[in-house]
Amino acid sequence: MIQRRKLLLLPLLTAVVAAGWLTNLSSAHASSTGNVIYHGGPVMAGNMKAYVIFWEPNGSFVSPKFNSLIKRYFRDIGDSGLYANNQQYTQTDSRAPIHAKLAGTFVDASPYPSVPFLQDADIQHEIMHAMSVQGWKPGINHAFFVYTALNEFICAPSLFGGFCSAPNSHLCAYHFGFGTPDGVVLYGAMPYAGNSLTGCFRGSSVSSPNHDIDADAEINLTSHEQMELATDPEGTGWFDTTGFFNGEIGDKCAGVFGPLDATGADVYFNGHPYIVQEEWDNAVSGCVISGP
């Protein structure tokens, strides 16, 4: 077997505060601290509904196929072997994440409230705006992904140091949540990966299986956050003994890819090529691209 390629990033940060939980997608190497452990909270049992928000003000830039490839990923991932890996991570009633689907998309061309740095509160407000416009509802099985454009950066909450996304720091993406009277809102904050391909992917010279390296890099970040939202949506699900700072199933395999084919893909979902990191599999105590 070809040796796995590794992405060199700094350690992932997860923390629980008030009604929220934060995960930074950054890890220098795959963790080797043993299997993940259940901590008594919910998972996204059954079907995850993914809602995608492209926040792209007039005049901003994303790569030509960025939106379409991200939407394709969400249509492809739900029946994949990678998502099936989540089925071993059950909650108290023995139910597990089974499937995921793209439930809705929204493109918002309204200006950012601040340039070039958005705060986490801005991301939360954007989600609430999209929910209001689209009629979307919160819930434990609903995941909202907010994507921003080139040269706009997202800053984590001040309680976590207020660090802003790469190349300003080693933050690449995170998942978080907040409560509303209608239920919990769970989301991934997804800065534009093209802002720092070296810090948040494999560099700019790697082969791009979809001929759009910004989109391929963003999909890799998306996959990491989606699998962690499925198995540890509230910071009380599945993570290892190091804690949820760097012990969720994506963290333990951050930067670990399968062998790449001639196109630069390490996996195919629904016949489409992708380059995404592996995820932790308790059944083999290691990283896999397809579950048990």
Feature roles, as predicted:
Residues 95-178:
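Active-site-proximal segments of metallohydrolase catalytic domains
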Residues 17, 26-28:
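Cleavable N-terminal signal peptides
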Residues 56-61, 150-155, 192-197, 225-228, ...:
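Solvent-exposed loop/turn segments at secondary-structure junctions
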Residues 2-12:
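Bacterial N-terminal signal peptides that target proteins for export
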Residues 11-21:
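Bacterial N-terminal signal peptides
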Residues 29-128:
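N-terminal carbohydrate-binding/catalytic regions of secreted carbohydrate-active enzymes
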Residues 165-216, 232-292:
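Metalloprotease/metallohydrolase-associated module, dominated by Zn2+-dependent proteases
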Residues 49-54, 83-84, 99, 104, ...:
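Structural recognition of the beta-strand scaffold that forms the well-ordered cores
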